[in-house]
Swiss-Prot record:
Its EC number is 2.1.1.190. Keywords: 4Fe-4S, Iron, Iron-sulfur, Metal-binding, Methyltransferase, rRNA processing, S-adenosyl-L-methionine, Transferase. GO terms for biological process: rRNA base methylation. [4Fe-4S] cluster binds at C86, C92, C95, C173. This is 23S rRNA (uracil(1939)-C(5))-methyltransferase RlmD. S-adenosyl-L-methionine binds at Q276, F305, N310, E326, N353, D374. NCBIfam families: PRK13168.1, rumA. Belongs to the class I-like SAM-binding methyltransferase superfamily. RNA M5U methyltransferase family. RlmD subfamily. It comes from the Bacteria. The keyword Protein biosynthesis does not apply. Signal peptide: none annotated. It is an enzyme of class 2 (transferase). Catalyzes the formation of 5-methyl-uridine at position 1939 (m5U1939) in 23S rRNA.
Length: 449
């Protein structure tokens, strides 16, 4: 569902507490980049302070077991503190960790992942590996909110402030791919001249393999002069332009269907389809999944929550046959289209609610040697028991939520699988987002019927 900026939107605020200053020493970072300290036996989370740094902080929230505080003054500085590259850092809510060296960010996220997996599964785990790309200029997709400021008679374009619905009017965004960052000022200029400038919702920027594109969400039908202005902008900047008058409609005003590359394959996608934000990490993630599954020419493989085929089609290049299962009809159709585009005839896509029992489906009858799943944040609770009944030799679980990965892992471990590899995917450097993948092996001698 589309979301729009509203200056009158109610913001929930924490109950004010009496101002209280503390001096604390941070010992670690949590997965979200907050410094973790102890004071009088209680954990204190404080933004902007790194491990080893001592700081004067002010409490903003005081609970029975923990407190939150804001930084007042740094008393010592860590050698792992670096200068943020973004001029909007600390105000913009997009990034939280640009002040921390990238190796510190990655080690903190990896440690948090392993603590969670160990605590929840009770298993003896191998050291986690790291999959990462460049810390800047990585983001190939972004949504910028738009709001016309009547008092100043100017268009604001940017991201939300931290813990606020207010907009930060950005002039630069160094985590964006350079092709997208270069569009910020000319795009702002173009949109500011539209007759519909007061009735714009947001703009999405996407860097496809065949060039950048934008999706403009507008609240009223556009005047022909506005459409022509956008066509002129598209031609001048080499950009494809799509118009979105509502949450469901999409019209190409100028340009070609976007594509991206993965494992040497070309995949077409709709501008609103999900694709991984970080291309470099996606390439490595797919390669790691293929290696962990140890795909053989005789293998029959199942890909659950397959989307448009990001893993499915590279698997089909190597296996005897692959079945992709997805709950979104449009993505199933796009997966089939991409299979035809890449001349892959050994892959079949099915639309299926993965909360249902898929073990009775005809395409399950032959069984599967290996399974890959890449669910959304809610995880795959509804399908884990079905995976154990299929008893594949290998399972690769790709996760955007370590909590649900840990929960679902327990089902596999209880069924006789062994967790042999874990990787932390730094898909979103400088943010608190943590993604991961895990490999489970099953003793074929104990496979269930």
């Amino acid at each position: 569902m589309a979301q729009f900026y509203s200056p009158n939107r109610r913001v929930t605020t924490r109950k004010a507490i009496p101002a209280k200053n503390l001096t604390v020493t941070v010992t670690s970072l949590d997965p979200f980049g907050q410094g973790v300290a102890r004071h009088e036996g209680k954990t204190v989370f404080v933004t902007g302070v790194l491990p080893g740094e001592q700081a004067e902080v002010q409490l903003t929230e005081d609970k029975r077991q923990f407190s939150h505080a804001k930084l007042k003054r740094l008393l010592t500085h860590s050698p792992q503190r670096v200068e943020p590259q973004c001029p909007h850092f600390t105000r913009c809510g997009g990034c939280q960790q640009q002040h921390a060296d990238i190796t510190l960010q990655q080690s903190s996220k990896t440690a948090a992942l392993m603590r969670l997996m160990t605590r929840e599964t009770g298993a003896e785990l191998p050291d986690a590996s790291l999959i990462a790309g460049t810390p800047y200029a990585y983001r190939r997709r972004a949504r910028l909110a738009l709001y016309f400021q009547a008092k100043e008679q100017r268009l604001l374009m940017g991201y939300r402030q931290s813990n606020s619905h207010d907009l930060v009017d950005i002039k630069a965004c160094p985590v964006l791919r350079p092709e997208l960052e270069a569009l910020l000022q000319p795009l702002r200029d173009c949109l500011s001249r539209l007759k519909a400038v007061k009735r714009l919702g947001h703009v999405e920027l996407v860097q496809a393999e065949n060039g950048p594109l934008l999706v403009l969400r507008h609240l009223d039908p556009l005047h022909p002069a506005d459409e022509q202005a956008l066509r002129d902008f598209a031609e001048q900047q080499g950009v494809s332009v799509y118009l979105a008058p509502d949450a469901d409609s999409l019209t190409c005003l100028h340009g070609d269907e976007p594509v991206y590359l993965v494992a040497g394959l070309t995949l077409a996608f709709s501008p609103r389809d999900f694709i991984q934000v970080n291309d470099a990490v996606n390439q490595q993630m797919v390669a790691q999944a293929l290696a962990w599954l140890d795909v053989q020419p005789q293998d029959r493989i199942l890909d659950l929550f397959c989307g448009m085929g990001n893993f499915t089609l590279p698997l089909a290049q190597r296996a005897a046959s692959v079945v992709g299962v997805e709950g979104v009809t449009a993505l199933v159709e796009k997966g089939r289209e991409n299979a035809r585009r890449n001349a892959l005839s050994n892959v079949t896509f099915f639309h299926q609610n993965l909360e249902d029992d898929v073990t009775q489906q005809p395409w399950v009858a032959q069984g599967f040697d290996k399974i890959l799943l890449d669910p959304a944040r809610a995880g795959a609770a509804g399908v884990m028991e079905q995976i154990t009944r299929l008893a594949p030799k290998r399972v690769v679980y790709v996760s955007c939520n370590a909590t649900t990965l840990a929960r679902d892992s327990k089902v596999l471990l209880a069924a006789g699988f062994t967790l042999v590899n874990v990787a932390m995917l730094d898909m979103f450097p400088h943010t608190g987002h943590l993604e991961s993948m895990a490999l489970f092996l099953h003793d074929t001698g104990t496979r269930k019927a």
